[in-house]
């Protein structure tokens, strides 16, 4: 029996077969590309951490440079702290995540061994406005944080405020917000405050009893990742 190619049945069968074939091909391609995608994600993360450490990797292999400098990872619950040895000095790198004006923002904050002085920062964003909020990734904004302290005079973790020029934070060190990008700048300020609070257990080890996360922090033990 000859199949009528103009019939509804033929159209349905043809469409179903094509959908199945395309779905299978997409699944195969996705599986084939998955390892490369994961490798790219890891490399981007390593580059961002090196950026927070102010390491120029343009003339070398960033993955190899990262492996030499970042020699440990500490885990506090679901939070990770990367430990680097930079010219014989210990640096702690904390991942950051928050919200900007149009989407997510994030980055990495590098602290000196005193867990107080900011060594460097590296920010990223999903969709902030070019020339305005997107400037959080640029050096003039990032360099303001270098040398700032996240603790107040009493040793409590209070973060660093991002404020419009002329405004002053009470009991906090501060940097200037980006002109014309109030919401993104506020997002960076909130991101730092919230994320540092989430790292209270790590930050307050060896720094007295001050804590931003409540009275149960002492029950959380740091765990080193297995190599």
Predicted regions and their residues:
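Flexible, solvent-exposed loop/hinge segments and secondary-structure transition points
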Residues: 2-227
């Amino acid at each position: 029996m000859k199949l009528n190619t103009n019939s509804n049945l033929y159209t349905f069968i043809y469409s179903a077969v094509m959908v199945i074939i395309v779905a299978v091909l997409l699944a195969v391609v996705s599986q084939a590309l998955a390892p490369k995608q994961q490798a790219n994600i890891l490399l981007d993360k390593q580059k961002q951490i090196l950026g927070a450490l102010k390491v120029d990797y343009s003339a070398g292999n960033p993955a190899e440079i990262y492996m030499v400098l970042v020699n440990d990872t500490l885990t506090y619950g679901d939070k990770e702290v990367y430990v680097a040895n930079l010219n014989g000095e210990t640096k702690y790198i904390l991942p950051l995540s928050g919200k900007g004006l149009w989407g997510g923002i994030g980055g990495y904050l590098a602290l000196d061994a005193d867990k107080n002085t900011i060594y460097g920062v590296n920010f990223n964003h999903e969709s902030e406005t070019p020339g305005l909020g997107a400037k959080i990734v640029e050096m003039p904004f990032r360099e303001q944080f270098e040398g700032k302290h996240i603790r107040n005079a009493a040793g409590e973790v209070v973060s660093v405020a991002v404020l419009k020029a002329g405004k002053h934070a009470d009991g906090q060190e501060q940097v200037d917000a980006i002109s014309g990008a109030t919401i993104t700048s506020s997002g960076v300020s909130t991101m730092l405050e919230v994320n540092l609070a989430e790292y209270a257990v790590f930050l307050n080890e060896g720094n007295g009893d001050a804590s931003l996360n409540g009275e149960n922090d002492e029950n959380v033990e740091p765990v080193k990742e297995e190599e």
